[in-house]
């Protein structure tokens, strides 16, 4: 795809994201998608990706990845249809469209919970997935965790509600089970550092993970009245 057409496709994707993700709480809003895009392009540079066509796949997949997030949508099939139609309208080749859709549909934490892994993920897949996971940890991750919990009226912490072990995909996705915001660190966020796939992602995750460990330790100290 020519450079001008690629730039136009990205602008249209940004507009689609703003439109489709409007009204969501700040944990999964358009700003999240834009941060993931920026992280993905930065990781791609560190991983040596320089082909404009490959970078376009990374950028569009990162921008569009949360339009069909199950936590906010009632019809994931329709949301994926919106994405597929958009990719065709902006002139991407069939192979590029298929790769972007594969990244979006396969990159979620819920897929690894259920062991539905892409056995040999492409570098582009790994980059976008790592970028999304980086935005889930560290200072931004802490802010997003409590923002989402607040939007669902979840308790910050309840010592009687323990983190769930060996989560199935169904339990992880359940909107019915009572959970606390602090438990999300144990059930998901603390696990992400060791699930990074690119060397660049692994390196960045170390600092963000340590920040969360310190935060949660301080949280428990303050909750118990010891600090």
Regions flagged by a language model, labelled:
Residues 1-18:
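Short alpha-helical hairpin
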Residues 2-5, 21-30, 34, 38-50, ...:
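Divalent metal-dependent phosphate-bond-processing catalytic cores, especially two-metal-ion Mg2+/Mn2+ enzymes
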Residues 30-37, 55, 59, 97-105, ...:
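Short, well-structured alpha-helical segments
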Residues 36, 77-90:
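An active-site-proximal "capping" alpha-helix that borders the catalytic cofactor pocket
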Residues 52-74, 79, 83, 101-111:
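His-Asp-centered metal-binding catalytic motifs of divalent-metal-dependent phosphohydrolases/nucleases
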Residues 72, 91, 97, 105-108, ...:
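RNase III-family endoribonuclease catalytic core
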């Amino acid at each position: 795809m020519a450079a001008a057409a690629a730039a136009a496709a990205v602008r249209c994707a940004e507009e689609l994201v703003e439109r489709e993700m409007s009204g969501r709480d700040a944990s999964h809003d358009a700003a999240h998608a834009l941060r993931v895009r920026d992280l993905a392009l930065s990781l791609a540079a560190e991983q040596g990706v320089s082909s404009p066509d490959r970078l376009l796949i990374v950028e569009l997949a990162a921008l569009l990845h949360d339009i069909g997030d199950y936590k906010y949508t009632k019809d994931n099939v329709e949301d994926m249809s919106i994405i597929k139609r958009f990719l065709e309208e902006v002139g991407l080749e069939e192979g590029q469209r298929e790769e972007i859709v594969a990244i979006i549909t396969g990159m979620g934490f819920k897929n690894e919970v259920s062991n539905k892994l892409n056995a040999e993920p492409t570098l582009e897949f790994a980059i976008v997935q790592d970028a999304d996971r980086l935005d889930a940890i560290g200072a931004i991750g802490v802010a997003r965790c409590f923002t989402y919990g607040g939007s669902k009226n979840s308790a910050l912490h309840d010592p009687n509600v323990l983190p769930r072990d060996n989560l199935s995909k169904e339990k992880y996705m359940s909107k019915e089970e009572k959970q606390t915001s602090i438990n999300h660190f144990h059930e998901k966020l603390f696990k992400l550092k060791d699930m990074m796939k690119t060397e660049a992602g692994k390196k960045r995750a170390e600092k963000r993970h340590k920040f969360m460990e310190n935060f949660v330790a301080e949280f428990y100290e303050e909750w118990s009245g010891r600090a």
